[in-house]
């Protein structure tokens, strides 16, 4: 990375993931996953449902894993096969859930951000996006990156919150919307 960024924001949502690098209090760069939703919240949700778990209960299971399965950073098709094989071999739900949490983070760090070493991330990391409500994903990030991450209480709505702050800042009393009403449509 050359210069260590003052702060980085890792955002993993239901369908995408991004890394926003802040330098001199300004967004310096944004990296976004290109196509696959592997490692995003919907991916974990699908697995949880396939095993008859809520996302919350599935995430809690991961915290009791003894041997998380290694799914690497592959696409969902390959991960599905790997999970099915692990199930046949007797892997517990906890080990599957933890393996998925690790794969989410590995995918974000090594495929999206394209780090060669997790320590290149720096130390001032804010995580956001609904996927980070999953404590297993947060803990996996902290273990792999070797840092303590800051997770706001409103991690899942940080983007909307930021947009609302900008709208409030730019609002003027005499502003008239150009948005069509239902009757005009």
Question: Where do the PLM segments sit?
Answer:
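Internal, active-site/partner-interface "lid" segment
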Residues: 54-85, 175-184
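Short, small-residue-biased leader/transition segments that mark boundaries at the very start
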Residues: 1-5
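Acidic, glycine/GT-rich loop-and beta-edge segments that sit at the periphery of enzyme/chaperone cores
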Residues: 18, 166-185
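Adenine-nucleotide phosphate-binding core of ATP-dependent small-molecule kinases
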Residues: 81-110
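Glycine-rich phosphate-binding loop plus the immediately following alpha-helix
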Residues: 24-67, 156-159, 165-169
